[in-house]
C-alpha cells in the first residue's frame, strides 16, 4: 500500500504481511459488554474514547477470548508485543490498505453510498453497517467515525500524538478520503472518534506493518525550525 503525508510532501510504500481487521467499528454494545459501562449499548460506534482507552479495550477483548494481549501497559507507557495473538489497533498502513480494498482513488465507491458525512446532516454516529461495504466486506471505513491507529502522527512536530483515520459524520465530503491523516494526544477524546480492531502476529519486535520504533525515535530527535502552516500542537 502507498501512503501519503501531505504536510511533509512525502510518499512511501509499505509491504504488508497478512492480518485481520474488524468488519465494523467497535460498537457501544461491544464496549459496554466488556468494560462494564453503565450504557446499555447499541450498534452505534463507541465514541468519546481516547487512544489509551482504546488500547485497554483491545487487551480486554483479547483476555475475554483467551488470546495473548497485544499491549503491555506500564504507568501510561504502551509497548506493542508484535508476536502476540491478541486484538490491537491497526497500523495506519493496515488501515489504509483495508479501507481502499484494492482501489486507488479517494473513495472506494460513491461517498454518499458508502459513508456518513456532513452531506447526510446527521447529529451523531449512525449504527454500523448501514451503508455499502468495500470489496473486503468492511463497512464505514470512510465517514461515520474516525478510527484510532497505533502509529505516531509525527514525533518531530506532534510528540506523542497518535494517528486517526477515516473521517466522521460531521466532516465535509471533500475531507473524507482514504489518504487523510489526522491525530491527537493519547488522552484526547471526541464525539466522532472510535476504533476498529485488528489482529496479526509478526517476528520483529521493533517494526511491523509500516511502523518502526527506530524511525519514530530518530524522527523525534529532530530539532530546529519546522515547516509553517501545520496545525498547532495542543497541550
Could you say what each language-model-derived stretch is?
Residues 1-62, 143, 201:
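A short glycine-rich, aromatic-capped structural motif
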Residues 40, 51-182, 186, 191:
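Functional-site microenvironments in short loops/helix caps that host divalent-cation chemistry
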Residues 20-22, 149, 196-198:
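Residues within well-ordered beta-strands of beta-sheet-rich folds
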Residues 191-207, 224:
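Short, structured beta-strand segments at or near domain termini in extracellular proteins/domains
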Residues 2-7, 28-30, 96-97, 172-175, ...:
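Short, solvent-exposed loop/turn elements at domain surfaces
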Residues 211-235:
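Short, cationic low-complexity segments
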Residues 70-75, 207-217:
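Short, flexible loop/turn segments with low-complexity composition
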Residues 5-9, 83, 155-158, 204-207:
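Short, solvent-exposed loop/turn segments that connect beta-strands within catalytic domains
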Amino acid at each position: 500500500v502507498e501512503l501519503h503525508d501531505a504536510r511533509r510532501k512525502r510518499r512511501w510504500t509499505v509491504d504488508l504481511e497478512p492480518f485481520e481487521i474488524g468488519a465494523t467499528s467497535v460498537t457501544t454494545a461491544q464496549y459496554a459488554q466488556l468494560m462494564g459501562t453503565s450504557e446499555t449499548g447499541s450498534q452505534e460506534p463507541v465514541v468519546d474514547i481516547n487512544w489509551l482507552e482504546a488500547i485497554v479495550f483491545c487487551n480486554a477483548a483479547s483476555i475475554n477470548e483467551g488470546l495473548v494481549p497485544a499491549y503491555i501497559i506500564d504507568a501510561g507507557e504502551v509497548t506493542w508485543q508484535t508476536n502476540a495473538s491478541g486484538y490491537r489497533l491497526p497500523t495506519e498502513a493496515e488501515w489504509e490498505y483495508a479501507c481502499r480494498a484494492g482501489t486507488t482513488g479517494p473513495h472506494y465507491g460513491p461517498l454518499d453510498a458508502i459513508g456518513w458525512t456532513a452531506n447526510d446532516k446527521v447529529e451523531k454516529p449512525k449504527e454500523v453497517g448501514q451503508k455499502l461495504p468495500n470489496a473486503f466486506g468492511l463497512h464505514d471505513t470512510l465517514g461515520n467515525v474516525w478510527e484510532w491507529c497505533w502509529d505516531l502522527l509525527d514525533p518531530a512536530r506532534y510528540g506523542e500524538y497518535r494517528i486517526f483515520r477515516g473521517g466522521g459524520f460531521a466532516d465535509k465530503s471533500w475531507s473524507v478520503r482514504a489518504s487523510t491523516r489526522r491525530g491527537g494526544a493519547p488522552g484526547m477524546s471526541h464525539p466522532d472518534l472510535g476504533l476498529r480492531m485488528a489482529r496479526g502476529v509478526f517476528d520483529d519486535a521493533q517494526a511491523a506493518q509500516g511502523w518502526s520504533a527506530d524511525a519514530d525515535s530518530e524522527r523525534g530527535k529532530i530539532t530546529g525550525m519546522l515547516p509553517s502552516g501545520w496545525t498547532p500542537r495542543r497541550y
